[in-house]
Amino acid sequence: MNKSSTKTLIALSMMAVSSGVSAHGYVSETNDGIAGSRAALCKFPTSDTQEKNRDCGAVQWEPQSVEGPEGFPEKGPADGQIAGAGLVQFSELNEQTADRWVKRPITAGAQTFEWTFTANHVTRTWKYYMTKQNWNPNAVLTRDSFDLTPFCELEYNMEKPPLYPNTFSHECIVPEREGYQVILAVWDVGDTAAAFYNVIDVKFDGNGGVVDPTWSQGGQINPTRDLNVGERVFTRVFDASGENVSLSTELVIENETQGQANNWTHALATKINKEQQNIGAGQLNDKGEFSPQYGPNPVYLKAGSGLKSVEIGYQLETVEPVYHLDIEGLASEYTIGDSATELDLSLYATGDMNVELTVYNHGKEALANTNVTLKDGDAKSVVMALSKSEKGHHMLVSRIKNMDGELIKQDMSDFHLVEEAVTPPPSGDFDFVFPEGVKDYKAGTKVLAEDSNVYQCKEFPYSGYCVQWTETATNFAPGVGSDWSMAWDKVN
């Protein structure tokens, strides 16, 4: 394997940089870089096909932070953790299969590798390693996956690469390979005991990287979402006159497995290749053959067909979630007693929801409040004790919100608080309701007493006691006073 001994350094175009970040750098293809790193393509689409890596985890927010122990290959990240630099937060990068990551086309020979810096460091070296020709693309990356002699090495003499403009590139001689390979770029900084590890997924084509000139890319099938059974995904084909619906290829999802994002992309690409003469989907080899992928699939248009582009459309089922709350146990009336009035309620939920219940009196004063989270099918009992109990109209207001806090429905139910009912004697069986008219009482006067019974004033000489009552002298009050029997006879 050849190892280049001379490198060409090129300062490239300006890019803005934030001086407040503490992160560092990544392999990019912003200007003339041959390929962006696996981490970079988690955040930025490719410059030509707009492909991106999916399900990357936290690295999609900070591809510049894939930093691990220096000293590769003797030291550095452990086998199986090389792509993520040994950092648990970037462990998704360690996944490795033949179709997991977007691959960038490359050819052997002189190629430019570009770095984007968000904060620069004094630098010892950049080193580039490549997988062996017979490596296993379906096994995690280990030291045994790579030729551990770097095919390119640049000494930088503890200087800082340019930060603004903050892309920096150098030329390397890429050795011969075939098919899918992984390049490991290691930036060894000089002011810490760390290095930055960027793996780059590339593909060597048998014809030296030149795509069959009879085909040009006109679109991309991306696994943007899972689809439900019965939903449809289809191509929208455009020529100079606009959309040509007769060239559309449609896939109806038949089962849950087919609806998984990586599966339907493969199925749609396969169907395109069966149905269309001037459209192909998948990886294109030097023989003009297409291989559908489980994941992103480029869509190609045949030269001379008059076709301009292909977009992807969806016909999705919109299933509105159902929310319903049954409240049982609310009575129309509650009798006021000596203790606080309580509402003993049972709640039954359809759909996941947050429920807020509030009791108001007629004056709109809140007397009780509770919040309950219910899952679909849940049943729960709640007891609401009112802060005060006064006779009259009251309201129970229920507010149903989804799990995002959005109001779904509000309902109000009326009820009343009533005082304990008193059954008076039949009309005409008493003359007064005690103590009304107390000064007019005489022998034979009948009164309705506080205990709801009727009493009759005794004959002389005891009748004189019947009028002896004030709010502070109640001993002759009928039925309840300490000496009531001296003045009164109980009638019922």
UniProtKB/Swiss-Prot annotation:
Q: Predominant location of this chain?
A: secreted
Q: What does this protein do?
A: Probably interacts with GlcNAc residues. May promote attachment to both epithelial cell surfaces and chitin.
Xref: CDD domains? LPMO_AA10 (cd21177)
What intrachain disulfides are recorded? none
Question: Where does the record place the Chitin-binding type-3 domain?
Answer: 443-484
What the entry lists under InterPro entries is as follows: Cellulose/chitin-bd_N, GbpA_2, GbpA_D3, GlcNAc-bd_A, GlcNAc_Chitin_IntDeg, Ig_E-set
Instruction: Write the protein's name.
Output: GlcNAc-binding protein A
Name the keywords, alphabetized: Chitin-binding, Secreted, Signal
List each copy of the Chitin-binding type-4 domain by range.
Answer: 24-204
Tell me the organism. Answer: Aliivibrio fischeri (strain MJ11) (Vibrio fischeri)
Where in the cell is the protein located?
Answer: Secreted
HAMAP family documented for this protein: GbpA
Gene name as annotated: gbpA
Q: Which domain of life is it from?
A: Bacteria
**Residues annotated as signal peptide:** 1-23
The entry sums up its family as follows: Belongs to the GbpA family.
Molecular function (Gene Ontology), one example: chitin binding
Q: Which GO terms describe its cellular component?
A: extracellular region
